[in-house]
Amino acid sequence: MTPLSSPLSQYWQTVVERLPEGFTETSLSAQAKSVLTFSDFALDSVIAHPEWLAELESASPQADEWRHYAGWLQEALAGVCDDASLMRELRLFRRRIMVRIAWAQTLSLVDDETILQQLSHLAETLIVGARDWLYAACCREWGTPCNPQGVPQPLLILGMGKLGGGELNFSSDIDLIFAWPEHGETRGGRRELDNAQFFTRLGQRLIKALDQPTMDGFVYRVDMRLRPFGDSGPLVLSFAALEDYYQEQGRDWERYAMVKARLMGDNDDAWSRELRAMLRPFVFRRYIDFSVIQSLRNMKGMIAREVRRRGLKDNIKLGAGGIREIEFIVQVFQLIRGGREPSLQSRSLLPTLDAIAALHLLPENDVAQLRVAYLFLRRLENLLQSINDEQTQTLPADDLNRARLAWGMKAENWPQLVGELTDHMANVRRVFNELIGDDEADTPQEEERSEPWREVWQDALQEDDSTPVLAHLADEDRRQVLTLIADFRKELDKRPIGPRGRQVLDQLMPHLLADVCSREDAAVTLSRITPLLAGIVTRTTYLELLSEFPGALKHLIMLCAASPMIASQLARYPLLLDELLDPGTLYQPTATDAYRDELRQYLLRVPEEDEEQQLEALRQFKQAQLLRIAAADIAGTLPVMKVSDHLTWLAEAMIDAVVQQAWTQMVARYGQPAHLDERQGRGFAVVGYGKLGGWELGYSSDLDLIFLHDCPMDVMTNGEREIDGRQFYLRLAQRIMHLFSTRTSSGILYEVDARLRPSGAAGMLVTSADAFADYQQHEAWTWEHQALVRARVVYGDPQLTSQFDAVRRTIMTTARDGKTLQTEVREMREKMRAHLGNKHRDRFDIKADEGGITDIEFIAQYLVLRYAHEKPKLTRWSDNVRILELLAQNGIMDEHEAQALTVAYTTLRDELHHLALQELPGHVAQTCFSKERALVQASWRKWLVAV
């Protein structure tokens, strides 16, 4: 055993003062002295439980003692009579065994692979023990869940990630997926439940038993986000639902996660065999699967971008060359070749590395370096976490913990440890970079082309200087370019740029100037790019990105030249520069039906309990997607209707995620309203009005939302902090508004306007569905019924969605007096025009002025309210284009007029989109769009001017 280093010997004196009664400095072994000096977690634990220290002093932990965990836990749970005592015993058992593992690990009594195995077996033992106790308790309360043939149904638990691979780290959270075999009902209990309800309640109690902090701490943080549909999906799924999801909707990244999935308790019963057989074809294809390469390349890009974005230099898991990159390297081969090569199907990393070597998929030396690096990094990670039983992978900044880690890793001192770590991570990064290579490099021709621009950049030319490379520019443009360069250099003098930053900038700028100044709009483009560069000069990683990836630089120049809005976004949020790396995704927005899944995958990388990082991630995802939509718009690959479709689908995905976050936070605090025990869903809906409801969002549109619930009176929540159910939904809506509007370093998510709710700003923020129906039928104004034409549920369970749709249909199909309706709609429009329109006397406001977009919207709304009682099909859609189609199909409007209004409407909206990209207001010269305006005005007179 290595003697304690000088700083640790000094710290031992502090430990001596805290030793439990009955133990003295002289009575303790050298082993105990080392462990208690190294780990505050171990010290705190034995102070609270001195018998654990006596136990360890009398007999050291053994490598194979994990085989006894299940028996030891069974003894500990023998006297448990309720959930509270179960939670206490689970927490004490976990702490006791973790002290034993920390002891063995610190002293190297057991090799590092066995430590990972012990940590994983401990977690599995606790999960299975808690499940089995709670299953029996739930059966006593509600009966045993059975299939239609009367066969009892178990809860099967898939351990994912490091837990599934038998490689859990010291203070890890656990990723789980719950499943049960077949539908049916409980039998033999005081009341009958269907199996879905039974297993959901069991799952909730199991998570609480493991996850909820008490005075004894918690057992494990439980993360359920890897299940189908993530947080928005059922907590527990039947085999049929699982199979359907993975066959029809399973994504490549879910295959990636499922490689390590392992059944907890791992019984060889028929149900377990069936579940394994069902999942195997999804994970491992029977052929060599090169189709997954692009998906893996995208994952690799995501990893590299996250390293850049979060500046994870001291993170041994997520940083460049860290644990995650080794895991990725191994899983690349598993996903591509695992179907054909059974030896690659191991859930554990090290056996898979051996198989990669045996199959000659990587050079022997690379495999050897990866193995050594992996074991080094995993030991370092576990030692780091065992100091305080804290889930961290970030190297410490304080001298004491640095001294501890250097001693634990058998290094002379901290600098030596950092040197060894740097070498290992560099080896990993090299293999990672060479895998699925997609890096770019300058060609000799590009180098030659940029060489003359070094003079322009480095020699600080004056406005009146002449230089051959600027000769093609007009005098004014040349002066502007030189002024911009000079001003930029002055700005740089004020910034604390290190030597590496200066070096990269000097390498980048000649290339950038060569590309920018070859354009006719060189001065304008450069004026948009220099603010962005000024914002990132102290962040060398982003300069390196533009310098090392010429393609990214070209896309930056093209997009900034095309749109000052994009230039402003990139300057404000430089992490968006990562999006420029892959033109395949930059100009191809996410498929409209895939935004939710992409966002779910994006959020999985952020700890669920880290609310601040969750807020940042939502905003970053939105900005990246917005950039891709705008890039496709500029490139002409998205017509106006599709731009709005994408912006709307994106907004719906964000709403879904925000509601999930708010719901999770509220339920953690109060439990959920008790009426939900008897039904599926959350009893909550978000209704989108206006542009969101009508699939017509623009780049800077806010969201018009109202919130509905179906909670009866006098219902309470079922948590420890019990509140009224309706109060719960009010606080939920307030939380949603807060999550949307909180300003982080990445800005706000969306401006949200909830004033279209019943009684407007004076009304309750959230309304019961019954109260909403009553208000619409008896109190709402005509303009509120007009707004309802463009309303639809954008988040909600089927029950509430059907209820809202029925109310909307009833209101819209109510017979109205034609003259009265015509007058009210026309007068409302005149009021709006007086308030909003014609502010720029010599300009045409595309939206608000006569003959503009709002007139078309009012015509469509009027005709739906006027004729829907005769033609109920008019209520089907909430967007103007399809409403105009319906009006023609149902004989209300002449087909030629409907088509002409549609063309006018899409033309005007297209112009608004492009004005937004140019950061210009929504008005143009009076001479513009005269044909469209005349057509709209004629239609207005036909329908809404009294005869």
UniProtKB/Swiss-Prot annotation:
GO terms for cellular component: cytosol. This is Bifunctional glutamine synthetase adenylyltransferase/adenylyl-removing enzyme. Belongs to the GlnE family. Keywords: ATP-binding, Magnesium, Multifunctional enzyme, Nucleotide-binding, Nucleotidyltransferase, Transferase. Its cofactor is Mg(2+). The keyword Transferase applies. It comes from Salmonella schwarzengrund (strain CVM19633). Involved in the regulation of glutamine synthetase GlnA, a key enzyme in the process to assimilate ammonia. When cellular nitrogen levels are high, the C-terminal adenylyl transferase (AT) inactivates GlnA by covalent transfer of an adenylyl group from ATP to specific tyrosine residue of GlnA, thus reducing its activity. Conversely, when nitrogen levels are low, the N-terminal adenylyl removase (AR) activates GlnA by removing the adenylyl group by phosphorolysis, increasing its activity. Pfam families: GlnD_UR_UTase, GlnE. GO terms for molecular function: [glutamate-ammonia-ligase] adenylyltransferase activity; [glutamine synthetase]-adenylyl-L-tyrosine phosphorylase activity; ATP binding; magnesium ion binding. Its EC number is 2.7.7.89, 2.7.7.42. It comes from the Bacteria. GO terms for biological process: regulation of glutamine family amino acid metabolic process. Residues 1-440 are annotated as: Adenylyl removase. It catalyses: [glutamine synthetase]-O(4)-(5'-adenylyl)-L-tyrosine + phosphate = [glutamine synthetase]-L-tyrosine + ADP; [glutamine synthetase]-L-tyrosine + ATP = [glutamine synthetase]-O(4)-(5'-adenylyl)-L-tyrosine + diphosphate. Residues 450-947 are annotated as: Adenylyl transferase. Coiled coil: none annotated.
